[in-house]
A protein has these predicted regions:
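A short beta-loop-alpha structural element at the N-terminal edge
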Residues: 15-28
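Conserved GNAT acetyl-CoA-binding A-motif
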Residues: 115, 122-134, 144
């Protein structure tokens, strides 16, 4: 993946840098996840407070499989977003998108800006459909994806388990990349997100 760095202005005028993740980001990424409130971490797929998990991610970093970007302010990571590519078979036109933003920077357009960057990469990779999976109790995440045009396609009963061992239904949401691109442009205009360079 070609290296890039973009500085954007959020809705409140805060300048934030968006760039691809690097192997050296392990400690900063771990600090980011450990600083998240437990409610925000409860529904993540792995124990992101575990140093070994983050180290494994950094060792296995491969942008042909997972496009991973971060948002940074004052050298601290404040957002993490990934696009998981299927690559082969009947799913090769699909990818899964995930995004986590520090609570302090939620509702300011940062999540939308991160997802827009990943959608741009999806277009480059000729991805036609994006999916997002979450637990049924993650209502705010569902609303966030609905705002950018994702639709709930399925709900699988007691399909996933949170980090406390409790079962939840898994919600699968889907969107066409072409429709999503237009929606992202509209949302960035709404949030008044400006790319500086």
């Amino acid at each position: 993946m070609e290296k890039f760095t973009k500085t954007i202005l959020l809705r409140d005028g805060t300048g934030v840098c968006i760039r691809p993740i690097e192997k050296e980001d392990g400690p900063a990424l771990l600090s980011f996840f450990r600083a998240l409130p437990e409610d925000d971490r409860l529904f993540l797929k792995e124990d992101v407070t575990n140093k070994d998990v983050i180290n494994r991610w950094m060792e296995e970093l491969n942008f042909d499989k997972v496009i991973a970007i971060v948002a940074e302010k004052d050298s601290a990571i404040i957002g993490d977003a990934t696009l998981h590519l299927s690559q082969r078979g009947w799913h090769k036109h699909m990818a899964e998108i995930r995004c986590v933003v520090s609570r302090e920077f939620q509702q300011k357009g940062l999540g939308t800006a991160l997802m827009r960057e990943l959608v741009a990469h999806a277009v480059e990779k000729r991805i036609l459909k994006l999916s997002a999976t979450m637990m049924d109790t993650q209502k705010s995440a569902q609303r966030a994806f609905e705002r950018i045009g994702f639709k709930k396609e399925a709900e699988l009963k007691d399909f996933v388990m949170d980090i406390n061992g409790k079962y939840h239904n898994m919600v699968i949401m889907v969107n066409d990349v072409s429709e999503l691109w237009k929606k992202m442009e509209d949302l960035l205009h709404y949030y008044d997100i400006r790319t500086m360079h």
